[in-house]
Design a protein with these regions (language model features):
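Long beta-sheet-rich domains in secretory-pathway and surface-associated proteins
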Residues: 159, 190, 206-361, 366-498
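Short S/T/G- and acidic-enriched coil/turn segments that sit immediately N-terminal to beta-strands
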Residues: 249, 358-360, 518, 550-556
Length: 564
């Protein structure tokens, strides 16, 4: 041994076996000074003069208090160096090798990373036993350009996988990546989501302000097609961003700056290896554009400790819309979900497709007794989401009365509210319904005014609104049982079809020499809930440069042409 194992191993193999008699050579060696390995070249299989020059060596003793396992040698060294021989580049990013594949933060954690040997930049102490998306494609590309291999028929069929469409997301906001896959053989599929953006990212510069490189580590394949970024544990703790991560730490962050992120999903069918049948894989790509014009999207209510809700009570939820309702994200509607297991699952829908306006009132569902309740708000058109930051406790109630809607618009003589009634007590419950201080000109008719059945649906019909002027009014319904009395506010917006002429307040009518940004305001009408604003360069309004519907009696027009 002349201190150059690469050249000596190559020579020994060629001299003793003949270079025409092997495709890859690799020496397993003992090293008294710990572990090391060297493939000699990236891409040497079937290359005469280099295909036998790789080695892996180790003292087979642990460098920490952890017991050393031969598996660590097999994965961290042998498989890593063989990966190089088959054309795979490094995937770590604690330093940049400018090949376009440094996509794992710090040391990385897959086979072609340097897990456990780069000090403060270590993601973890040893490699996980799988190849990164980049490594698989490096190897496939290398093999495809070689002819020394023997082709065999693989009876196992390739699965198909979809990463879904690309998305534009708000900054500072968690998101979920979800794949769908099928296997023609019915094999079990394992999913692995990995970020593909290359660039130097070590522990010192890892964080939410990077425009390039990795912001999320690779995680081992799992049966779940969903990857939450950051992981749900961090989201529930409110740790969406992290800087200077430690070994064994999070190594995942959302972005607080504009950037583009490319993700890949690898679907492995884990087919049991046998002669003529080996496991197969499929891949797909997803691109995320993060924009600072929107976000962070976050829940702003139920974030303090010690919150107690009673089943059947009405609670107000608030969230920061943060321009997510505007282009290019365009989330007009969101859904509100509830978890009773501390955020592991969100199996109860509180609201579906409600307006993304930052505030909603929900009725706490019955049949729940939990100290680990969380609220999750998800857009109907995207993959980002927000969760409140503290557990809520829900205590049971003997009965729950909920309405499909708690507000109605009365343009006619009467309105109807539909309700559902449930009993959650072991004792007999009889609940009577009545209104508190109903105006004398109004009358209420209940389909069921005495509720005794455990589960029933009914209606409340209120008439006489033609006797009242246009206004918004609150009617308080009392549901009185043996052990609980609950008051429920129902809002009625009384409207007439008598619309007065709108008077422009600012700017003055026919006033000229306005700036390109104009503040419009006009007299508010009692019977109007919305107004349509149209801007045209034509006196006949035959075409429009702007047309929008708003809820208030003022708006700002920005970026107008000088000729408008």
């Amino acid at each position: 041994y002349d201190k150059n194992l690469n050249s000596e191993v190559q020579k020994v193999l060629d001299d003793n076996f003949g270079e025409e008699n092997y495709d890859i050579g690799h020496l397993f060696a003992y090293a008294s000074n710990g572990g090391n390995g060297d493939a000699g070249y990236v891409g040497s299989v079937c290359q005469n003069g280099t295909k036998g020059g790789a080695f892996s060596a180790h003292s087979f003793q642990g460098t920490t208090t952890d017991p050393f396992l031969n598996d660590h040698f097999d994965i961290d060294y042998v498989t890593h160096e063989m990966g190089h021989q088959f054309g795979a580049f490094h995937t770590f990013s604690f330093r940049n090798e400018f090949e376009g594949f440094n996509s794992e933060p710090g040391s990385g954690s897959t086979i072609m990373g340097y897990a456990g040997i780069v000090g403060f930049d270590n993601v973890q102490r040893h490699s996980d036993p799988y190849f990164h998306y980049h490594s698989i494609h490096n190897i496939n590309q290398y093999i495809d350009n070689k002819s020394c291999y023997l082709s065999v028929v693989n009876e196992n069929q390739i699965p198909t996988v979809s990463a879904d469409r690309d998305y534009t997301l708000p900054v500072g906001t968690a998101y979920e990546l979800e794949a769908t896959a099928t296997d023609p053989d019915g094999d079990t599929i394992y999913y692995c989501w990995e970020q593909l953006d290359s660039g130097q990212v070590d522990a010192a510069n890892f964080g939410p302000y990077n425009h390039l490189g990795a912001q999320a580590r690779s995680l081992p394949p799992s049966l779940s097609p969903i990857r939450t970024t950051p992981q749900m544990e961090a989201v529930l703790e409110g740790n969406l961003t992290i800087e200077n991560p430690q070994t064994g730490g999070q190594w995942e962050t959302v972005s607080l700056v504009d950037r583009t992120m490319t993700w890949a999903v690898t679907a492995r069918d884990r087919y049991p290896a046998s002669e003529g049948a080996l496991g197969r894989m499929a891949f797909d790509i997803k691109v995320l554009k993060i924009i600072s014009d929107a976000g962070p999207f976050k829940v702003t209510s139920q974030n303090q400790e010690g919150i107690l809700w009673e089943a059947g009570s009405k609670q107000t939820l608030t969230w920061e819309v943060a321009q997510t309702d505007q282009a290019p994200i365009n989330t007009k509607f969101v859904s509100v979900l509830l978890s009773t297991d501390g955020g592991e699952t969100f199996g109860t829908a509180l609201l579906s497709s409600t307006a993304n306006d930052g505030e909603e009132v929900i009725t706490v569902p019955g049949g729940i007794s939990s100290e680990k309740v969380r609220i999750k708000i998800v857009p109907d058109n995207s993959i980002y989401f927000a969760v409140n930051s503290n557990d809520i406790e829900i205590t049971p109630a003997p009965f729950v009365l909920t309405f499909d809607r708690y507000d109605q618009e009365a343009c006619q003589e009467q309105v109807t509210f539909a309700f559902d009634f449930e009993i959650f007590s072991d004792t007999d419950q009889s609940v009577s319904l009545s209104f508190s201080e109903l105006p004398s000109v109004l009358s209420a008719q209940f389909s069921e005014s005495q509720l005794t059945d455990a589960d029933l649906s009914g209606t409340v019909n209120i008439s006489g609104f033609e006797n009242l002027p246009a206004q918004d009014m609150i009617l308080t319904l009392r549901a009185e049982g043996q052990t609980l009395t609950r008051s429920i506010d129902l809002e009625v917006k009384i409207r007439e079809d008598d619309f007065q002429e709108i008077q422009l307040l600012t700017p003055a009518n026919t006033e000229q020499e306005q700036s390109r940004t104009v503040s419009l305001s006009w007299t508010a009408l009692q019977n109007a809930d919305q107004y349509k604003v149209e801007v045209s360069e034509s006196e006949t309004f035959s075409s429009f440069t702007l047309s929008k519907t708003i809820d208030s009696s003022s708006t700002v027009l920005a970026g107008l042409d000088f000729s408008t």
